[in-house]
Amino acid sequence: MGYLDLALSYSNQPQTVEAPASGGGLSQNGKFSYGYASSAGKRSSMEDFFETRIDGINGEIVGLFGVFDGHGGARAAEYVKRHLFSNLITHPKFISDTKSAITDAYNHTDSELLKSENSHNRDAGSTASTAILVGDRLVVANVGDSRAVISRGGKAIAVSRDHKPDQSDERERIENAGGFVMWAGTWRVGGVLAVSRAFGDRLLKQYVVADPEIQEEKIDDTLEFLILASDGLWDVFSNEAAVAMVKEVEDPEDSAKKLVGEAIKRGSADNITCVVVRFLEKKSASSSHISSSSSKEAKEMPPLGDLAISSNEAKQVQIGSGNKPENVTNRKPDTASRSTDTLTLERNSVTDKV
């Protein structure tokens, strides 16, 4: 959610809300499992996107997870989903200086998006909340108000900051650049946009930057899980309440589905997308964190090359008002098959697009 007119974009008439689309998987090294769920909620259109991706880089398994909440249309969020992580993992300093690589990838992706939008005389934008798992490091970056929260030692800890125009440092930056912040239902940049950092937003780019804030956490046996979600969840959940709910459900896909379903029940008026990553430092690779719908277990596999499996390379479903699910043929049958010898056990991967 971002632009002023989006606040009125859903109907007040009773609507049938479909069950969230969901899926998940387990890393081949058994160090983490993940699940996701996504729903248009009460809205007639879907502008949330997400990515769950596991790559083998220099013989090391790397996890990349992201939630992207579009405004002014779905184009920007879809673009960021498709390009951000590809730009990141090809950065020459991705392993050696991950934070610098993330900053460069965010800004490069934004620059390329703006070129695309400008050539078509269009303007759309997107938040991003991303989590990169590299070795024993969790590196979280964000622009906008899609939030990242971890549970460490049983406590909820925000590892991102919502970028809002009324925050003193953000307001000062905007005003120093020649912009202004005014109240229009909530505080907005130029009276229009409710976030102060985002991808895209061509007409406000001088004030609405895509420079990410980055926070790093050590992955150890006190780090239990991570929640990434769009503001459709956080509008009706505190950090503590979300963490408490995930604690009750061992499987990350079921956790994500429960959060999204409960957000709908609580009256969230926005699209809702959630990714849950569980860290399995104390558990073996055969841990039961895989969804109960899958009876397969990860097997030992050959040494890794530069292997990539992402949520948009497996079976995809298009969800939205009036659209039937669309099956997309897997583009990498040799690496993204349903065999237990794959790098990750992917299930029901979803592209949440309208």
From Swiss-Prot:
The keyword Transmembrane does not apply. Coiled coil: none annotated. Residues 289-354 are annotated as: Disordered. It catalyses: O-phospho-L-seryl-[protein] + H2O = L-seryl-[protein] + phosphate; O-phospho-L-threonyl-[protein] + H2O = L-threonyl-[protein] + phosphate. Mn(2+) 2 binds at residues 69, 231, 270. Residues 33-279 form the PPM-type phosphatase domain. GO terms for molecular function: metal ion binding; protein serine/threonine phosphatase activity. Keywords: Hydrolase, Magnesium, Manganese, Metal-binding, Protein phosphatase. GO terms for cellular component: plasma membrane. Residues 309-328, 336-348 have a biased composition (Polar residues). Its EC number is 3.1.3.16. PANTHER family: PROTEIN PHOSPHATASE. Belongs to the PP2C family. This is Probable protein phosphatase 2C 69.
